[in-house]
Amino acid sequence: MDRRRAFGIVLVLVSACGFGSGGLFAHPVYEAGVGWQVLSAWRFGFGALLAWIWLLASAERRRGLGLVDRRTAVVAVALGVLYVGNSGTYYAGLETVPVGLAALIVYVYPAVVAVMTLRFGRRLDGRRPWFALGLALAGVVLALGGVPTGAMPPLSGVALIVASPLIYSVWIVLSARLSGEKRDAVGGERAEGTDAAAATALMMTGTAAVYWLSALFLGLPVTPDRIPGAAWPGLVGVGVVATFIAIQAFYAGVRRIGAAQAALVSTIEPAWTIALAALLFGQTLAPIQLAGGALIIIGVIIAQAPPEAFSSIRPGVRMADE
């Protein structure tokens, strides 16, 4: 393995662990009495600020921003607004759903995306996406079924967590169009599109604006003087590690190893979250829930693996990468 590829894998691992740490950082924030809306406002506030600093610090990235036309900029900001639906449902659900269980449920999104691309995305033929989605959903059923009756989270919290990957899947398909992906492109091919750093800064700005405006409109305690000191480490962590670093590391890793391989490497994310949730907060999963998690990850691997990986099983089936 060459050095560039190895570094790309490391970057994607860093990204997966960063994204997977979001719920872990949120836990002490909630315990300090800060709600999910305020957490999200600061999360994307920090993320957007750092994204713009990163963008403007490089002449090459500044040139990329200059090439973004008005329509593309509006679309990027609109995608940021749409991202509120995904992030909001997830972090609202985390107020009542254990972090490890939430991580398992949310990770069905790659299988959902694989099915959505049959109609709305890249060229993706055959029944494999449906099989992958079926495995992932069976895993969710096992994960929920393993919760003791007396410890079952509120249905509203579970519904919010389930809604998150569905909204995120729509967001992924739409943002792929913004990046220049063609509907008839085979997985792994990428057209020229909007500069990643510019698109990220614009999208996070849109997300941050919605959270901050809504928090101020609702009179939530979002200003620094109204936030408990115990909440700040978690707020900074979720904004820096789980947002800015995670996103930038993922883009950098994809450039080195490709989106398909990045998607497979990212399957470490739920395992990372579950392990740390057990270590830090004592939130352990039952064996049947871990079996459900294994089904979800297998479904993701089937959905995202390149076609040649299964050519001996069913020739002629093409798979797209995430």
Regions found by a protein language model. Name each.
Residues 51, 116, 125-147, 276, ...:
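Hydrophobic transmembrane alpha-helices of multi-pass small-molecule transport proteins
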Residues 7-15, 62-89, 128-133, 156-164, ...:
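Loop-to-transmembrane-helix transition segments
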Residues 26, 31-85, 110-116, 135, ...:
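Transmembrane alpha-helices of multi-pass small-molecule transport proteins
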Residues 29, 39, 43, 77, ...:
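Hydrophobic/aromatic residues within transmembrane alpha-helices
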Residues 1-42, 81, 89, 132, ...:
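Glycine-/small-residue-enriched transmembrane alpha-helix faces in small-molecule transporters
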Residues 18-23, 55-100, 106, 142, ...:
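Specific transmembrane alpha-helical segments of multi-pass solute transporters/efflux pumps
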Residues 16, 42, 102-108, 174-209, ...:
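Helix-helix packing/entry segments at the starts of transmembrane helices
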Residues 38-49, 83, 90-124, 163-164, ...:
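Specific alpha-helical transmembrane segments that line the substrate/conduction pathway
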